[in-house]
Amino acid sequence: MASATLAFSCSSLCATLKLPQNLNPLLLNVPPLSKPFSGVVSPPSLSRLSLLPVAAKRRRFQEIPEELKAEFEEFQRPPNQKPQLSDVLPDDFQAPEPGTPEYNDIINQFLPKKGPPPPREEIFAVVVIGSRQYIVIPGRWIYTQRLKGATVNDKIVLNKVLLVGTKASTYIGTPIVTNAAVHAVVEEQLLDDKVIVFKYKKKKNYRRNIGHRQPITRIKITGITGYEDYPASTLEAEVEAKEEAEAEAEAEAVPV
């Protein structure tokens, strides 16, 4: 009898509140059957009713005023279309045909072309910084180990140059290129990405998960100088030396 009264009360409550059919009945504050039932169901709390779906209100945009509609229609164009000369020039202006010098002059006037980029020196070098070797090119930047005592915008000179390469020749050091220097500027002092060091001992309940960030320095290469007086080794000279060595080896192999 108590269960029938509870079902009737719940159905009448849902009909009164007009709750959706897919609503979870656990959201309602229904007293458990283990307690004495008085026949009256307590109304749901406001926090439970706040979970009910609410119809979203549509926002209406304000219409364009009548005095601005004419100007808006003049500049209205299909989507994804580039601006035309007619949007800038007056209506009575007669635009020249595309491809003519007059048309190009107008295009250059409104859309000036960028000048050619400055010529870049085609040269690279291999330099040693902190027991590591780096390939450096003027105009580019690299990350190295922390340079102690260096601050931002400091100019530095790297003297341990192992090799210098140009478009015409190559300068190979023995072990370094004499008087060669790489000029750079310190841009930033920062920390590298975090490295996780995990330590584990079997059957000892010992685990350590410690992180570490290595200090590094970012430098920008500005130039490579001082290699001109060093003897260069070209590809043709290497080929000739190789041919001479092969000829001498063949001459020694021929019996007298």
From Swiss-Prot:
Pfam families: Ribosomal_L21p. The keyword Ribosomal protein applies. One of its GO terms (biological process) is translation. It is found in: Plastid, Chloroplast. Residues 1-55 form a transit peptide. SUPFAM superfamilies: L21p-like (SSF141091). Its main location: plastid. One of its GO terms (cellular component) is ribonucleoprotein complex. GO terms for molecular function: rRNA binding; structural constituent of ribosome. Component of the chloroplast ribosome (chloro-ribosome), a dedicated translation machinery responsible for the synthesis of chloroplast genome-encoded proteins, including proteins of the transcription and translation machinery and components of the photosynthetic apparatus. Belongs to the bacterial ribosomal protein bL21 family. HAMAP family: Ribosomal_bL21 (MF_01363). PANTHER family: 50S RIBOSOMAL PROTEIN L21, LARGE RIBOSOMAL SUBUNIT PROTEIN BL21C. This is Large ribosomal subunit protein bL21c. It comes from Spinacia oleracea. The lineage of its organism: Eukaryota, Viridiplantae, Streptophyta, Embryophyta, Tracheophyta. The gene is RPL21.
